[in-house]
């Protein structure tokens, strides 16, 4: 009979509270992603101000229903300008949503109730209205670059009211 695996300690379960981004294992780093896919939306930068504008157009590799990459392992080959998040760049990427777990941990803040590491449920990011599910209007390549300005939206920079709650609504 196989030994029953030991339950991780509370400290191990809450690794994002005790470790820096640099100290995290590869598995911990990957699990920090909440699966919202907001970072997978096409963005435009104003040449005059440097301000970043989100659109509701997804990367060509985005599975808009699952809110994940269709080929995560090969994303950089298929989309050369895909930004691979690292402990160094999450501190400098101004376009990361304020709700992004990488950004929160880098700023010394805790995760929201809807984050799968907190809730234990990968669907809470969708229930809270944080993910892009149901909001993507098209994918890269379906809309011309000239038309992208017509698809600028503000919601990716905002946090829905129910997501701001201290705990999961009943």
From Swiss-Prot:
Disulfide bonds: none annotated. InterPro entries: Puta_zinc/iron-chelating_dom, UCP006173. Coiled coil: none annotated. It comes from the Bacteria. Belongs to the UPF0260 family. This is UPF0260 protein RPE_1881.
């Amino acid at each position: 009979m196989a030994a029953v695996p030991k339950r991780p300690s509370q400290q191990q379960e809450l690794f994002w509270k005790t470790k820096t981004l640099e100290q995290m294992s590869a598995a911990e780093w990957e699990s920090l992603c909440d699966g919202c896919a907001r970072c997978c939306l096409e963005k435009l930068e104003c040449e005059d101000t440097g301000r970043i504008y989100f659109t509701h157009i997804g990367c060509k590799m985005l599975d808009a229903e699952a809110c994940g990459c269709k080929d995560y392992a090969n994303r950089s080959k298929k989309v050369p300008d895909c930004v691979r998040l690292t402990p160094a760049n999450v501190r400098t990427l101004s376009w990361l949503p304020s709700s992004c777990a990488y950004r929160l941990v880098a700023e010394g803040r805790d995760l929201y109730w809807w984050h799968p590491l907190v809730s234990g449920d990968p669907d809470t990011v969708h229930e809270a209205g944080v993910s892009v599910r149901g909001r993507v209007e098209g994918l890269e390549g379906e809309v011309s670059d000239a038309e992208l300005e017509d698809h600028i939206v503000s919601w990716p920079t905002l946090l829905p009211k129910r997501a701001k709650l201290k705990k999961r609504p009943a």
